[in-house]
Amino acid sequence: MGVKGYGEAPAIAYYNIPVEKMIADLEQKKNFIEKFAFTEPERYWHYLHHLLPQNNFLVCALDIAAWDMYAKLKQQKLYDVWKGNVQQNPVTDYTIGIDSIDNMVAKLKEKPWPIYKIKVGTPDDIGIVKALRANTDAVLRVDANAGWDLDTALKLIPQLKELGVEFVEQPLAKDNWEGMKILFQESPLPLYADEACVYEQDVVKCKDHFHGINIKLTKCSGITPARRMIKQARELGLGVMIGCMNESTVGSAAVAHLLPFIDHVDMDGPLLLEEDVATGIDFDYGKIIYSNKPGLGIEYTGLYHKEIKTKS
């Protein structure tokens, strides 16, 4: 039996790329995908990028699988292929989604963690953060999901700093570059781009508007472009975070192997699933523990046919 590589792309309704579309595109292009003379992942990604120009999610899954297989063929862990030092890896945050304040506090208490990512964008964002801060000394990060206007951001961010918030993610609408330039100059906290930085060409636009970027493998189309985005961000003096879209252990393992090269990570997807489809990474109070297997280090458990539910 040959070497197998595994990849993942979640189906997110908001982006209108359901599982059915990914399967249909795979079936339609199957011969081209399988017959490519694979030598290394970067060349394969460029081929896929042109073969499937309207399906970044599917390209991401195939790209991750290519890197997994490539490292397995070398009998190395993927981070070793890139000469990554995992000793100083960032720890992952744990996300508290928007809910009633009482429920958000309850979720925090249920999951003791060193870093929390707090979703905001409500009429009482400061009330939320105050209540959470009263119940933990952990690091707090705030994700506004493009939910504020400039005046609101200018008003709230100084108060968030007083509450010990570390940084703010995507405070304004993704296309409000004029507002972000003003906020960048005025904000007492670092600002990280999420919706405003999806593709490689977006990175340079973030300079002088954000202090860092949040890369999503699924959105940018895989590990290959993500590595180039990291390099570009470093050259521009931007911080780098990698986020998740509720991937299982398969997609999260891809993020895990990039940890030596980034500053922050949000990869709590497997913690939010009732059922996973693989094993291979563990969480020790935010610290990522790798398996001893090559490639992504995962073992596929064959549960893909079951319904995977996300906890509310």
Give residue ranges: language-model regions:
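Catalytic alpha/beta core domains of metabolic enzymes, predominantly
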Residues: D175-M267
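Metal- or metallocofactor-binding catalytic centers and their adjacent structured scaffolds
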Residues: K4-L73
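N-terminal amphipathic alpha-helix/helix-capping segment at the start of soluble metabolic enzymes
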Residues: H46, K72, Q76-P90, G286-S291
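Conserved, mostly hydrophobic/aromatic
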Residues: G2, L62, Q75, D143, ...
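Structural recognition of alpha->loop->beta junctions
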Residues: L156-V168, K207-I213, H257-A278
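Flexible C-terminal active-site loop/helix
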Residues: M245-S312
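Hydrophobic faces of well-ordered beta-strands that scaffold small-molecule active sites
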Residues: G5-G7, P90-I96, P114-I118, L140-A144, ...
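Metal-dependent enolase-superfamily TIM-barrel catalytic cores that perform enediolate-based chemistry
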Residues: D80-S187
